[in-house]
Amino acid sequence: MKIRSQVGMVLNLDKCIGCHTCSVTCKNVWTGREGMEYAWFNNVETKPGIGYPKNWEDQEEWQGGWVRDVNGKIRPRLGNKMGVITKIFANPVVPQIDDYYEPFTFDYEHLHSAPEGKHIPTARPRSLIDGKRMDKVIWGPNWEELLGGEFEKRARDRNFEAMQKEMYGQFENTFMMYLPRLCEHCLNPSCVATCPSGAIYKREEDGIVLIDQDKCRGWRLCISGCPYKKIYFNWKSGKSEKCIFCYPRIESGQPTVCSETCVGRIRYLGVLLYDADRIEEAASTEREVDLYERQCEVFLDPHDPSVIEEALKQGIPQNVIDAAQRSPVYKMAMDWKLALPLHPEYRTLPMVWYVPPLSPIQSYADAGGLPKSEGVLPAIESLRIPVQYLANMLSAGDTGPVLRALKRMMAMRHYMRSQTVEGVTDTRAIDEVGLSVAQVEEMYRYLAIANYEDRFVIPTSHREMAGDAFAERNGCGFTFGDGCHGSDSKFNLFNSSRIDAINITEVRDKAEGE
């Protein structure tokens, strides 16, 4: 058993209001610079829709994630080692700029400098790539916001598989939900396997997946290998970049920027302990519908004395174990079984999980729109948001985990409403879904009124425990595309200018000499 710790995230889609605050703050902090204008490490999509980039869920087109061969082994869908190498100089399955969008601003200066005329001056869009005026803006990262566009285009959503999607194009049957997306920081990342340069790695102390900007050579095969399309090519520096899970903040015990600024307080951060030796077995599961359960088996119980003893032997700090015991991510994913992984069929074992949305379902039930079942709860198999659609997104098509999560949240609401409105304790609903009173009350506290310290349980890092302190001292932090400036490498495949670090000692000596 090889015990490792991972900082995971849960997003409660039941509370997401689609305000895009997480996207804007992430953009301002990490990608508001030349070469990354089109990149959104965090974006919020309206579902159903084809998303950003276009049709990112269609792995037959983009060749992301893993596939299981007949011998029971998994390999990148992009190809084995030789198959990846053959695509170095001509990768046919990398998204083009039109699959994202041409980033633009507006000619605001014209509003001030326009000469006097008969008509009010307008701010025309200008491309942020070549600076030229654009005749028409035709796509964007949130183009499908609030079901924008005709249903014919949104119907290409891959989550409509095994469904009669035509009926959902009718006004009375339409539905929508928000889906915030960021890098999944997977346990079995396919981007790591498809990088020919070995530039992508997963940190042992917190599981964050990063790209070494000095090793990256801009082959862009990682973009194809990532099934979530959350790696972006910086055309200015010639490097690939991705969400870094705000690791400088995580190391000091602070939440990510997107979590800190979330208006709806839908995000939870916490530590999970897992057995790294079980990853290959879990990812190689034969049936895709079993992948969710197999991934859950990878996680370890942080309250188990034998797990604690072994974790301490393997160098897991005590504060990490304590944080894992209080982790809201473990509670939602393992204890209550509310959170589910995004597209587990990609076999990457993602670590950003989602609580399926219930609010539109509950309001529909209150209006008497759902048939009653034999128990207290309505028959939520026939809901406004189709359960099969959520299952295709969160559990590889298996409706069981989705129904369990939705029923438990509805039972929690029934129980709390009976207490606050009727003044009685009605446990029939929670008994029906297999929850105790203590579990439901704790669920309510975390989902409805959780404090800051409840939602974000992040242990500080221990740099003093590094096996090689010299390498840690010389390692660089996040850089904006130029690598660790002071390296010896002068070769640049893309012939872009390199910004070398300023030698402070030489500058000071020169100043003193003058």
Swiss-Prot record:
<keyword id="KW-0534">Nitrate assimilation</keyword>
<feature type="binding site">
    <location>
        <position position="222"/>
    </location>
    <ligand>
        <name>[3Fe-4S] cluster</name>
    </ligand>
</feature>
<feature type="domain" description="4Fe-4S ferredoxin-type 2">
    <location>
        <begin position="174"/>
        <end position="205"/>
    </location>
</feature>
<dbReference type="GO" id="GO:0042126">
    <property type="term" value="P:nitrate metabolic process"/>
</dbReference>
<keyword id="KW-0472">Membrane</keyword>
<keyword id="KW-0408">Iron</keyword>
<comment type="subunit">
    <text>Dimer of heterotrimers each composed of an alpha, a beta and a gamma chain. Alpha and beta are catalytic chains; gamma chains are involved in binding the enzyme complex to the cytoplasmic membrane.</text>
</comment>
<feature type="binding site">
    <location>
        <position position="195"/>
    </location>
    <ligand>
        <name>[3Fe-4S] cluster</name>
    </ligand>
</feature>
<feature type="binding site">
    <location>
        <position position="19"/>
    </location>
    <ligand>
        <name>[4Fe-4S] cluster 1</name>
    </ligand>
</feature>
<keyword id="KW-0004">4Fe-4S</keyword>
<feature type="binding site">
    <location>
        <position position="186"/>
    </location>
    <ligand>
        <name>[4Fe-4S] cluster 3</name>
    </ligand>
</feature>
<feature type="domain" description="4Fe-4S ferredoxin-type 3">
    <location>
        <begin position="207"/>
        <end position="236"/>
    </location>
</feature>
<dbReference type="GO" id="GO:0009325">
    <property type="term" value="C:nitrate reductase complex"/>
</dbReference>
<feature type="binding site">
    <location>
        <position position="191"/>
    </location>
    <ligand>
        <name>[4Fe-4S] cluster 3</name>
    </ligand>
</feature>
<keyword id="KW-0560">Oxidoreductase</keyword>
<feature type="binding site">
    <location>
        <position position="183"/>
    </location>
    <ligand>
        <name>[4Fe-4S] cluster 3</name>
    </ligand>
</feature>
<dbReference type="GO" id="GO:0042128">
    <property type="term" value="P:nitrate assimilation"/>
</dbReference>
<dbReference type="InterPro" id="IPR029263">
    <property type="entry name" value="Nitr_red_bet_C"/>
</dbReference>
<dbReference type="GO" id="GO:0006974">
    <property type="term" value="P:DNA damage response"/>
</dbReference>
<feature type="binding site">
    <location>
        <position position="26"/>
    </location>
    <ligand>
        <name>[4Fe-4S] cluster 2</name>
    </ligand>
</feature>
<keyword id="KW-0249">Electron transport</keyword>
<keyword id="KW-0003">3Fe-4S</keyword>
<feature type="binding site">
    <location>
        <position position="216"/>
    </location>
    <ligand>
        <name>[3Fe-4S] cluster</name>
    </ligand>
</feature>
<keyword id="KW-0411">Iron-sulfur</keyword>
<comment type="function">
    <text>This is a second nitrate reductase enzyme which can substitute for the NRA enzyme and allows E.coli to use nitrate as an electron acceptor during anaerobic growth. The beta chain is an electron transfer unit containing four cysteine clusters involved in the formation of iron-sulfur centers. Electrons are transferred from the gamma chain to the molybdenum cofactor of the alpha subunit.</text>
</comment>
<dbReference type="GO" id="GO:0046872">
    <property type="term" value="F:metal ion binding"/>
</dbReference>
<feature type="binding site">
    <location>
        <position position="246"/>
    </location>
    <ligand>
        <name>[4Fe-4S] cluster 2</name>
    </ligand>
</feature>
<dbReference type="InterPro" id="IPR038262">
    <property type="entry name" value="Nitr_red_bet_C_sf"/>
</dbReference>
<dbReference type="GO" id="GO:0009055">
    <property type="term" value="F:electron transfer activity"/>
</dbReference>
<dbReference type="GO" id="GO:0008940">
    <property type="term" value="F:nitrate reductase activity"/>
</dbReference>
<feature type="binding site">
    <location>
        <position position="258"/>
    </location>
    <ligand>
        <name>[4Fe-4S] cluster 2</name>
    </ligand>
</feature>
<feature type="binding site">
    <location>
        <position position="226"/>
    </location>
    <ligand>
        <name>[4Fe-4S] cluster 3</name>
    </ligand>
</feature>
<protein>
    <recommendedName>
        <fullName>Respiratory nitrate reductase 2 beta chain</fullName>
        <ecNumber>1.7.5.1</ecNumber>
    </recommendedName>
</protein>
<dbReference type="GO" id="GO:0051536">
    <property type="term" value="F:iron-sulfur cluster binding"/>
</dbReference>
<feature type="binding site">
    <location>
        <position position="22"/>
    </location>
    <ligand>
        <name>[4Fe-4S] cluster 1</name>
    </ligand>
</feature>
<dbReference type="GO" id="GO:0005886">
    <property type="term" value="C:plasma membrane"/>
</dbReference>
<dbReference type="InterPro" id="IPR006547">
    <property type="entry name" value="NO3_Rdtase_bsu"/>
</dbReference>
<keyword id="KW-0813">Transport</keyword>
<dbReference type="GO" id="GO:0051538">
    <property type="term" value="F:3 iron, 4 sulfur cluster binding"/>
</dbReference>
<keyword id="KW-1003">Cell membrane</keyword>
<dbReference type="Pfam" id="PF14711">
    <property type="entry name" value="Nitr_red_bet_C"/>
</dbReference>
<dbReference type="GO" id="GO:0009061">
    <property type="term" value="P:anaerobic respiration"/>
</dbReference>
